[in-house]
Amino acid sequence: MDYRNYDRGYAEPTMSASDYMTRTYRWMACGLLITFAMAYLTATTSLIYLVDSLYLVLTIAELALVFVLSSRVQTMSVGAARAAFFGYALLNGMVLSYYFFVFSASTLVMALLATSLYFGLMAVYGTTTHKDLTGWGPRLMMALVAMIITGFVGMLFGFGFGGSVLYCGIGLVVFMLLTAYDTQKLQQMYSYYSADAEMAEKASIYGALTLYLDFINIFLYVVRLMGNNRRRS
């Protein structure tokens, strides 16, 4: 969502900054609830066999939804943007059901608590810091692309990079920093879209998606790190 090309004019804000942030975190929380509920339901029922046979299709479908929402949110209706976000959260829950099937409930609960702490600390930092974090964006994107390529190469040749402590540790740090960056970006988006009620609502949904992705990825890396530690012990 490129807010920099939007003509914001000089109209009065249609919602306060606090209302905007509250809506964003509310949508994010709803998305997480849908994902975790769907992951649990899938892992504990025969749906797990459906996911196993359609894993590639589900993965492609959820990536397509993210791409559509990210690239076309400015031209979509609020209802369509909301449906795309919740649809992605639902599909992602099915894809992530593997973790609920493999890892114990205690590991998942501890990982969720740790993720909430890490995410919360970085979100507070991104909200309160006076430092401009804009410069972090390109560097973090480069790190993310490097991790994706490394993980793909490792999977292709059976090196197992994706589950290593070093790889998971780097991934955890990258998404914690992205949380701070995305949180500050939310405030910048508000300053551009606050005068347009529809655009502000869509920006809130898009912001919820970015924070949702940060939270989910932090959670996954924490789960893997805990799994590695337990296997060694």
Language-model region placement:
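A hydrophobic alpha-helical transmembrane-helix feature that marks the membrane cores
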Residues: 1-233
